[in-house]
Amino acid sequence: MYIRFKIGRQIYQQRLASAILFGLLALSTVLASWLKSSGFHADYVYQLELAVGGDTHLHSLLAFLLTLALYRVLSVTESGYNMVLVAGGLVTLCCLVDEGLQAFSPLRTFSVQDILASLIGVAVACAVNTLLAGRRQRKRRNT
């Protein structure tokens, strides 16, 4: 129990802005998905999709940003390659759950293309995070 409080305190003290950014990104992603599924003010989501180039581009962009932000939050505890995999795995799981739930919504359709777009966003973010983690480890070794 003490470990959880210690990690929470570390995130609060060292990565508060990153945690807020991740929370806002996650909340806006869930809200956009819910708005499209319910049909309630879905035109705002469609306008956002058009602004970024389409539905698949939005999937890639959000998965990319969520993975980067989550790694930034989680790297306060350990900045190695394991956290890259944890962040990528959690975002991938959430993307799969969201796309799977669309199969049960009458206003939405399940799309493998959307899953692949999300996986591409996660993979690119994991590559960036891996480069950053490697750079941090080399910097620590040299000091």
Range-by-range predicted roles:
Residues M1-V73:
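"…centered on the first transmembrane helix and the immediately adjacent amphipathic helix/loop
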Residues F40-Y46, C95-A123:
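Interfacial helix-loop-helix junctions of multi-pass membrane proteins
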